């Protein structure tokens, strides 16, 4: 699954996009062959690996590199010291780490539920449209590897390894801190030995070391937190943003933008989709297996209707996919909470709490994708309903290809 999904990404990036660029007269290789795999956060990792960190007192107005955690750019820098170019090093680390994460995840799920759910879990991880971030110059691969390894080690009562992997996860991303309450609550509830508590406190190791670095270099141990203000001025649940996204699906982006129903046909179309779905449910016994084809057709139709972004908000594209991935995954995690390891379930809920309280709706879908227990839950669902799994993965493959096209052109994705 890893190889096939990566081949799709490579084909779109290096075969399809050059043709699109030539016919559309756009530039996709300003810096080199790897530019299609380099966008947004990638630029910050390049700056850190080549020039180091920076920080200033005007952090509420100016973006500083210290907001990005060090393990990924540090790993790239180490490879650069032996002659490996930045792009090659960054891509090797992320892709190989993502592959290793899939292998670890497969073994963990297989030991709990058998081969079929393990296969579906890795399929969900590899074919989710946001698995694109496991192929480009981003931190997804490393974070997946360390967080999954930490959860699996703790679940298997390998507390030394749990502490080591969890410390590396917080050195990669601040969201790894969700492992701390997950380990502590699990240790308390399951009455685990003192070693489990030591593993819990080791989670903070990556953040503590980075804080010491910030204190020594910039005189501010929390510089990485303060620097976040340039990207977001508030925190908390972005209710207005999520409501706007929901309204994009229900009444259409054009009507949301103007603040009233200007395009009457979109709400009528949405109502027809809802009524059709109700009819499919009502006559499900008569329709039999044909019902699922009807639902899939309605899903594709609603996606085509709603995928337009707000003209005033470039971060508002694909609202239907984002809402289903984020809140659908949260509901599924709750429903599957007794079927996945307790420590994984607790970690998942704390990770959602962090992701949904950033004060923004942008990038939340990518943060949710990086919550390993979410894929665990999707794997269990698809193993139970494989025909739905095949349909969902086919759709995900299409979206993955479309996301590659957007990323290659430096359009906002997540």
Language model features: what each stretch is:
Residues 88-89, 105-127, 144, 342-346:
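Transmembrane-helix signature of polytopic, membrane-embedded enzymes
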Residues 77, 89-112, 275-280:
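Transmembrane-helix motifs of polytopic, lipid-linked glycan transferases
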Residues 104, 124-127, 142-161, 180, ...:
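Specific aromatic-rich, kink-prone transmembrane helix
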Residues 5-22, 37, 180-314, 321-324, ...:
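Membrane-lumen/periplasm interface segments of specific transmembrane helices
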Residues 113-115, 150-161, 187-191, 339-340:
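Membrane-interface transmembrane helices that cradle and orient dolichyl/undecaprenyl
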Residues 38-84, 238-250, 355:
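Short hydrophobic/aromatic helix or loop-helix immediately within or flanking a transmembrane segment
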Residues 61-66, 70, 74, 82-100, ...:
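Loop-to-helix entry region of an early transmembrane alpha helix in multi-pass inner-membrane enzymes
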Residues 136-142, 364:
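Short acidic/glycine- and proline-prone juxtamembrane loop motifs at membrane-interface regions
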């Amino acid at each position: 699954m890893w190889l096939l999904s990566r081949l799709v990404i490579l084909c779109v990036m290096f075969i399809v996009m050059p043709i699109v660029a030539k016919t559309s007269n756009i530039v996709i290789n300003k810096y080199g062959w790897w530019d299609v795999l380099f966008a947004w956060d990638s630029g910050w990792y390049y700056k850190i690996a080549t020039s180091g960190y920076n920080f200033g007192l005007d952090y509420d107005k100016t973006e500083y590199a210290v907001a990005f955690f060090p393990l990924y750019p540090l790993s790239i820098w180490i490879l650069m010291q032996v002659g490996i170019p930045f792009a090659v090093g960054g891509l090797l680390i992320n892709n190989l780490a993502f592959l290793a994460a899939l292998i670890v995840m497969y073994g963990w799920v297989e030991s709990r539920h058998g081969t079929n759910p393990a296969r579906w879990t890795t399929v969900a991880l590899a074919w989710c449209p946001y698995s694109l971030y496991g192929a480009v110059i981003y931190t997804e691969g490393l974070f997946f590897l360390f967080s999954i390894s930490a959860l699996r080690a703790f679940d298997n009562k390998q507390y030394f390894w749990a502490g080591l992997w969890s410390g590396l996860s917080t050195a990669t991303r601040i969201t790894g801190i969700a492992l701390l309450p997950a380990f502590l609550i699990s240790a308390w509830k399951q009455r685990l030995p003192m070693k489990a508590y030591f593993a819990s406190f080791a989670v903070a190791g990556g953040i503590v070391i980075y804080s010491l670095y910030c204190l020594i270099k910039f005189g501010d141990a929390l510089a990485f937190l303060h620097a976040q203000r340039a990207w977001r001025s508030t925190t908390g649940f972005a209710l207005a943003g999520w409501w706007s996204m929901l309204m994009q699906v229900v009444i259409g982006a054009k009507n949301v933008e103007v603040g009233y129903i200007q395009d009457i046909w979109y709400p009528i179309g949405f109502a027809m989709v809802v009524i059709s779905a109700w009819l499919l449910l009502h006559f499900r016994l008569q329709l039999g297996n044909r019902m699922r084809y009807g639902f899939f057709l309605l899903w594709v139709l609603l996606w085509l209707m709603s995928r337009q972004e707000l003209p005033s908000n470039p971060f508002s594209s694909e609202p239907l996919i984002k809402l289903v991935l984020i809140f659908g995954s949260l509901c599924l995690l709750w429903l599957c909470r007794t079927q996945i390891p307790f420590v994984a379930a607790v970690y998942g809920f704390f990770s959602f709490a962090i992701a949904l309280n950033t004060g923004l709706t942008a990038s939340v879908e990518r943060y949710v994708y990086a919550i390993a227990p979410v894929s665990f839950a999707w794997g269990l669902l698809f193993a139970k309903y494989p025909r739905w799994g095949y349909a969902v993965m086919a759709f995900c493959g299409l979206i993955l290809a479309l996301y590659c096209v957007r990323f290659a052109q430096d359009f906002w994705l997540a």
